[in-house]
Amino acid sequence: MFYNFISKDSILYRLILCFGIGIGTVFGLSPFSFFSAGVFASISCIFLFFSLNRTSIWKAFLWLLILSQILNFTAFYWIPGAISRISGANTFVSILFFFLYGLISHLKFFLFYTLFRFSKIDSASKTYILLIFPAAGTLSDMITFQIFPWYWGNLISGSIVFEQFASICGVYGLSFLLLFISSTFLILVNYYKYKNSKEFKTSIASLICIAFIYRFGLYRIGYINQSQNELKPKNLSVLMIQPDTSPGTKDLKADASYLSATMSKVFSLAIPTFENSPSLIVIPESAIPFHGTIDSEENRKEKIYSSTMEGIILYLSKHTGADVLFNELNLDENKLRNQVSLFKNLDGKTERYNKRRLLPFGEYLPMEKNFPFLRSIFQETSRYVPGEFPKLLIGNKIQNQRSFLPPEISKLNEPKTYRYEFSSIVEHTNKIRNLEYSYSILPLLCYEAMFTELVLDYFQNEQKPEVLINITNDSWFDSELEAYQHSGAVRLRAIETGLPLIRSAVSGISEVWDARGIPMIVPIGFHETGTRAFSIRLDAIESTIYTRFGNSFLWIFCILILISRLIFVSRIERKS
């Protein structure tokens, strides 16, 4: 009936489907997280692909280009402002880059459609679509480069039960699941009147598979809640702060009043007001911008080292007996590193992880060597150098740690005073005697947490992480929608790894999830100032299937499906 009014070949029909994908995407992602919206987006994608099959591939690609920009304007409209604030580019350049971003980040639709088109499926009622459509979409998710990554699997966030499937197949497995559910729905709708048909029976078999996955999700939610190690529980008390300080633009680097106010705010929030001190204090990315705590000649020369910043970290640890996790910048052989650092109360030493996945045009300038003039356009862009290796940060829980006052607070800019306190042999020996346990942190800096591959790296070694901590600075984006989309994508890392995840953001959203991706605290909202004190369990019973095998089986499965279909199509064409 619908097609009596709108032709499948019409511009209006295709525009409606493009907007269906865009609107379904924005409402499928956080903070809305409507499961039905994700299904709606994927079904719109199916019908768009069938409509594009009726035209030339070049016209189809033109429509996919239009789709990429519609997605930009509906789901990621905050990007132009973010580009301007992060890089210092003017409005014209930011808008131009916005269009370019839409093309690059949505290249997956071009691959997705190409795989689908050459699979020669001529109708949404064909049962082949049950596997071909999900396999093509999942492969395109896994292969194509994205700057701010979103996957079809992120659109399943409205169902915490289905999300548990990520512990087996990761976010890409959720992509396959969502597209499989949508394809099953279409087959079922087309053949529900023909209950004796092969197609209807196939759709019922698909529904049974989906029901098994749902049952697994229910089981995992209950199982993890009941399977904590009660014999030797490892409870880690944490204090997380959100200072909501303004972004550190380059013109503020020499502003003493700005830096003083920023450091004072961080310091006042991080000093616990309760009787029981935490074992770990988490300070978000760029809470204290521009500076680092390594007192080296090159850091002093470039005015990166801050004695006050070092004094604050030492004071907090001495006052509370806690380890302190924070973000800093340091020069390492003339290479500027963006780091997650853990100051350890046990021995007064600092472990550091160098950020590996840098943000283009924010933390480094692509092609700057070939086009040096770009620096004059993107003036706020930093010159960070990426790290090469994953690195766990090892903290320590010490028994009977009590809050007490270290040397005078007036000496914050004289860290040598505090360093001396940590060098006491007697005190160090006493701490070792009272060491309860050590714990391992998987550090993720800013949007690194959106890339599941960066997390899987840590599970290839003998020593495994016990908690994921993502410190981030979303204040550059100044968009509540972006903050929720970023946070929602990060949450899946907890389910994939079966580990608790702490997300500390300088301006929000700051959250904590357990191994099932279920919130453990009331989040600190966007542009709120606050703290959260909580306790997490670090006694994961076993690794998830996903951390043991990664994406290998899903790669093989999707490739075999598409190759089998292409072989089948080529044989049919030869016979004809």
UniProtKB/Swiss-Prot annotation:
Annotated membrane topology: Multi-pass membrane protein
Protein's GO biological process: lipoprotein biosynthetic process
GO cellular component: plasma membrane
Cellular location(s): Cell inner membrane
Gene3D superfamilies: Carbon-nitrogen hydrolase
Pathway named in the protein's UniProt entry: Protein modification; lipoprotein biosynthesis (N-acyl transfer)
Enzyme Commission number, as recorded: 2.3.1.269
Family matches, as Pfam families: CN_hydrolase (PF00795), LNT_N (PF20154)
Keyword NADP part of the UniProt annotation: no
Domain of life according to the entry: Bacteria
Claim: Cell cycle is one of the keywords in the record: no
Function statement: Catalyzes the phospholipid dependent N-acylation of the N-terminal cysteine of apolipoprotein, the last step in lipoprotein maturation.
Family, per entry: Belongs to the CN hydrolase family. Apolipoprotein N-acyltransferase subfamily.
Name of the featured protein: Apolipoprotein N-acyltransferase 1
